[in-house]
Amino acid sequence: MASLIEWKVPQAVQPRPEDYPYDLERALSSVVGLHSIIPSDAFTADTLGLERAGNGVLIDDGLVLTIGYLITEAETVWLHLADGRVVQGHALGFDQETGFGLVEALGKIDFPVLDVGSSKAAEVGERVVVGGAGGRTRSLAGRIAAKQEFAGYWEYVLDEAIFTFPAHPNWGGTALISAAGKLIGIGSLQLERAREGKNEYLNMIVPIDLLPPVLNDLRKFGRVNRQVRPWLGLYSTEIEDKVVVVGIAPKGPAARAEIKTGDVVVAVKGDLVSTLAAFYRKVWALGHAGAEIPLTLYREGVTFDVRVNSSDRAKFLKGPRLH
């Protein structure tokens, strides 16, 4: 298996061992590269691609934590280790609510695990390292810029995501390492914000405190044993205090209900919504997957009601092969 593309973080923002009270090199050796192959008929093939690459973190013997979209519907996974070896992995599972994914290494890794810390204890302004596979030259010294709610266009909400600055250029699955050398989050996205008349980029990190409640189920069953949220199968964004549909999942509930790109979501069961987070939470409050979701929409000057028969998103995905 060929190595992942060669690149380096600019030297000015690479972490220096003398700046940290823990063994930086040891901590970064726990971060692995990840490369996955997705079948062409996968539900996420068009949106996320047939080949995906990023990072993962060794959190237990042979167990790698990553961001779930890298391994969703993966039929083949390769792990690139700090010593140059490449080991095949098995996608154990992906949790839709948190965004975490788990991979089991099918060969010996022989590197230390990164101890899990507390994301709740992490403070805005705290010095952190965003660790990428390949050591210091592919890792970034930064700080926590914010801890706040995040809503994603794919029907996803975190009550308190972590945002770091500057942004890591290969953020997916990176390890957010605290000032004490503990794992406090997993890299998910790069976002842009305007500040002092200029645009700057941040990383959005999934906080590690969301992992313990889901870890055992993911490891054993490939998904979490909880009531499944209703899924509408639409992509939406906020534009001037309005929730606007920007995409429809093929053959999903919204497509069956003939919701269209450009529709404005006015209300859920009569309750007005103006933010993504409020929209999703009102939908989820109406029951579990399969629940009928009453929406009020606005389209081309006309306001109308529609009922969407929600579904379980996982039923549209190729699941991990249990072993």
Where are these regions (language model features)?
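Conserved active-site neighborhood of the chymotrypsin/trypsin-like protease fold
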Residues: 8, 39-41, 53, 58-139, ...
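A short, Trp-centered hydrophobic/proline-enriched beta-strand micro-motif
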Residues: 25-47
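PDZ/PDZ-like groove recognition
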Residues: 8-12, 40, 167-170, 217-282, ...
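C-terminal cap/linker of serine protease catalytic domains
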Residues: 1-24, 111, 137, 179, ...
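Terminal peptide-recognition signature
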Residues: 32-34, 56, 62, 66, ...
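Gly/Ser-rich catalytic serine loop of serine hydrolases
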Residues: 50-55, 113-119, 161-179, 250-256
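Active-site loop architecture of trypsin-fold serine endopeptidases
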Residues: 46, 74-76, 111, 131-143, ...
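Gly/Ser-enriched beta-turn/beta-hairpin loop segments
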Residues: 41-49, 92-99, 147-162, 194-196, ...
